[in-house]
Regions:
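A solvent-exposed, acidic/Ser-Thr-rich amphipathic alpha-helical stretch
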Residues: 8-75
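Short, solvent-exposed coil/turn segments at beta-strand boundaries
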Residues: 102-110
Length: 128
């Protein structure tokens, strides 16, 4: 949905009670709402085109690295990948490494979402 810039479909993956900690947050207990994420996604889609998430890796069973087996269904997943985009106005191609911690509720909706990437490094590409 994100790659196709379908904001409605993308946001349908998130619970109304979503707690989102974006890459601009300084601590893991600083959250924004689903509405804040929707506004951020809307802005992002206006600024960039040709989105692609490549080299993805998913780790289930725990959001934190562990060698112990875990059967708790509420432990979430870790997602890693490389995002590629094209700046709408300049046509400049930009990319960044990305990582997310994602937890799902019983309805299959994401109720907590923490995503991480180097915002300053990403923005610096626009001037190089």
């Amino acid at each position: 949905a994100f790659v196709n810039e379908d904001e409605v479909m993308f946001m349908n993956n998130f619970a109304d009670s979503l707690k989102w900690s974006g890459p601009d947050k300084k601590t893991n207990d600083d959250f924004d709402s689903k509405e804040d994420l929707a506004n951020a996604i809307n802005s992002y889609m206006k600024i960039y085109d040709d989105h692609a998430l490549k080299n993805t890796t998913f780790y289930g069973g725990s959001v934190y690295s562990t060698d112990k087996p875990n059967s708790d269904p509420n432990t979430g997943i870790r997602v890693y990948g490389d995002w590629y985009h094209k700046h709408t106005e300049t046509g400049k191609e930009v990319s960044h490494k990305w990582m997310a911690l994602v937890w799902f509720n019983e309805a299959g909706k994401i109720y907590e979402f923490r995503d991480f990437f180097d915002v300053n490094g990403f923005l610096k590409q626009h001037t190089q």
